Amino acid sequence: MKKRILLLAGGQSEEHEVSLRSARSVLAALPRDQFDVTPVVISPQGRWLPPTDTQRALETGEAVRGGDLVLHRAASAEGYDAVFPLLHGPMGEDGTIQGLLTLAGIPFVGSGVLGSAVSMDKVMTKQVLASVGMPQVAWRLAVRREWQERPQEVRARAGELGYPLFVKPANLGSSVGISKVSGPGELERALDLAFSLGRRVILEAMTAHKPRELEVGILGNDAPIASPVGELRFEADFYDYETKYTEGRATMHIPAPLPPEIAERVRMLALTAFRTLDCAGLARVDFFYVEQTGELFLNEVNTMPGFTTTSMYPKLFEAAGLSYSELVTRLVELALERR
């Protein structure tokens, strides 16, 4: 008997359109002899769209208005065997939709409330992973009220790290709101931007040399496996939003040309991060590798990475011998297995 799958896409984050592209790929890849798939697009306003508007959004990529409030439509997930929440960023990848589905008792692809929420928040990720000795660059936390009332304290923290440094909102994805700050004169503008997007901000030291950006895919629940290591190459100072989503600005190299011992260490660190954060199903774990010194630093853990057929995560497992269709099928199996 076919399994009934509810595929959620769109959402309220900056990655709404990326999610729609991923959903089109997954929708085409799930074997029709095994699954009966119903897509539902969530609008940027948080509304669950009816079938005709969902189809239009998937075909055109346009941000459609209208639809029902999420709680009014949550009951519509009843009767499905599993949900594939192909949502990125806040209100999709941060434990919110996972909490709703958990309350409803419906299995879903990906990490649960804890793994999703902690991995989405850069501060919590760093603090939890520090407890297991995960290598990370030096960083400091600042909150909006401190910046408004005691800006000299925030400036002092930046001075402790030294310049240049990065300023990042603590709980946004897709490189939104990130600034490279070359000196004290650029700090105010960067902090104002980051605090306009959230109340908590991370100040993060830069590595001594421009690092290579390495990525590893993780697949599984309590016995996860790691993919080969991939590398992103680009000319920009860092992997910002424009570089990430402008075709031709970055290239993928799978497997990354690395000494075998470095590649194996990256994979082992990625598995440690996945287990420590209590992730499930899938994740893409990103690292900085400073070739000149041999240093590795964990950058972030992405619990619902981009999922088009040309995205890094599926390409990593394709290199391991798992086709795109086999990968999405396995993710649904893992969702059903976990509960």
UniProtKB/Swiss-Prot annotation:
Organism field: Deinococcus geothermalis (strain DSM 11300 / CIP 105573 / AG-3a)
Residues that hold ATP according to the record: 158-213
One GO term of the biological process aspect: peptidoglycan biosynthetic process
Family: Belongs to the D-alanine--D-alanine ligase family.
Protein role: Cell wall formation.
Known pathway: Cell wall biogenesis; peptidoglycan biosynthesis
Gene (name only): ddl
Catalytic activity: 2 D-alanine + ATP = D-alanyl-D-alanine + ADP + phosphate + H(+)
The protein, known as: D-alanine--D-alanine ligase
Record GO cellular component, one term: cytosol
Signal peptide location: none
